[in-house]
Amino acid sequence: MARVKRGVTSHAKHKKVLKAAKGYYGRRKNTIRIAKQAVEKGLQYAYRDRKNRKRNFRSLWIQRLNAAAREHGLTYSRLIDGLAKAGIVVDRKALSELAIHEPAAFAAVVEQARAALPAETAQAA
């Protein structure tokens, strides 16, 4: 059987890694050993941050809802409690978009949540 030197295969692999390392700084972009490490680390960061992005956006929506609810005299936790008791099922993303782009509609939702809360809880806020 003929001897296979794998020059074409390794060249293709190296090109693939260097293409992924395009835009990196220093030897990370053109030295295959260092570029390979940098690309692998970048993929690890990408995997981790795809998970973190979901947490970060949920946290952002909650912060926005808390600020918007406080403008109407409720806290975030009381707003969510009131929505649950009123049977209003809207996710936090939609609520925060409503608070930003449709303040009048958000105010109506807050009023429904406030009406569903017990009287002393609504007065305390």
Curated annotation (Swiss-Prot):
<dbReference type="GO" id="GO:0006412">
    <property type="term" value="P:translation"/>
</dbReference>
<keyword id="KW-0689">Ribosomal protein</keyword>
<dbReference type="GO" id="GO:0019843">
    <property type="term" value="F:rRNA binding"/>
</dbReference>
<comment type="function">
    <text>Binds directly to 23S ribosomal RNA and is necessary for the in vitro assembly process of the 50S ribosomal subunit. It is not involved in the protein synthesizing functions of that subunit.</text>
</comment>
<dbReference type="Pfam" id="PF00453">
    <property type="entry name" value="Ribosomal_L20"/>
</dbReference>
<dbReference type="GO" id="GO:0003735">
    <property type="term" value="F:structural constituent of ribosome"/>
</dbReference>
<keyword id="KW-0687">Ribonucleoprotein</keyword>
<dbReference type="GO" id="GO:0005840">
    <property type="term" value="C:ribosome"/>
</dbReference>
<comment type="similarity">
    <text>Belongs to the bacterial ribosomal protein bL20 family.</text>
</comment>
<dbReference type="GO" id="GO:0000027">
    <property type="term" value="P:ribosomal large subunit assembly"/>
</dbReference>
<keyword id="KW-0699">rRNA-binding</keyword>
<dbReference type="GO" id="GO:1990904">
    <property type="term" value="C:ribonucleoprotein complex"/>
</dbReference>
<dbReference type="InterPro" id="IPR049946">
    <property type="entry name" value="RIBOSOMAL_L20_CS"/>
</dbReference>
<protein>
    <recommendedName>
        <fullName>Large ribosomal subunit protein bL20</fullName>
    </recommendedName>
</protein>
<dbReference type="InterPro" id="IPR005813">
    <property type="entry name" value="Ribosomal_bL20"/>
</dbReference>
<keyword id="KW-0694">RNA-binding</keyword>
<dbReference type="InterPro" id="IPR035566">
    <property type="entry name" value="Ribosomal_protein_bL20_C"/>
</dbReference>
